[in-house]
Amino acid sequence: MSTNAMNRLAALFVALSVLGVGAAALYRFSQQPKFQLKRVDVRGDLRHVTALSVRSALVGRLRGNYFTMRLDDTRRLFETVPWVAAASVRRVWPDRLLVTLTEHRALGVWEDGRLLSDRGELFVANPDEAEIYGRLPVFSGPFSAAKDAARRYYELSAQFAPLSLHITEVDISDRKAWSLRLVPSNHEGARPSEGLVVELGRDRAELPLTERVAQVVAAYPLVIAQIGAAPVRIDARYANGLAVSTMAKPMKSERPVRP
């Protein structure tokens, strides 16, 4: 082996030794007791998340210290807390975590007992804790329809507002056909079988749901004037008219919601 090669090899060994010593020193430094997490500060506009619920979800599960904690894993851990929609986590020197939480806002109850957020996400939480939002509408249908259900709910609610009708049930079939149950806004405590059922069918380019609802809203006062009472069912699946019934027929979502 040439002298130059031996010199390069010796320099490499020296460099590796220095790196090894440095890494060992850094490891010993990072393991000092003063870097063990001693405090977790939680912030956010929180109405449901409590210190107890956070502690119950995280006890014995936080791993690492200021240097070794994996922030992505920790963030996902906080997002398992009931009502938490999103979390951000950052370190605060030398022994703290600052966690900012965003809560779900409940829009309704899905037929399987989970809550539907206003962003169309299904999540597990105690439905009784959602009472601060008032009586929640019940949604039924394939889980893949959740995002569309939330978005459409706001659109359709705004359309029915001039009639002072409030949506209490939304049913989406496997074929994506829509049915709604509505009650007068001052009778939101009505029994599940009461109110007006509106069959809208599928959302089609040539006859969108919003257009069909507009037809119902325009015709509703005329229907009441003609039959002398509020109808219990309106079938708006037709392109050129509405079918009105005064005989009630159960909706799929009238089945008991599973806990």
Language-model-detected regions and their locations in the chain:
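Extended, alpha-helix-rich binding/interface surfaces that flank or overlap catalytic cores
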Residues: V42
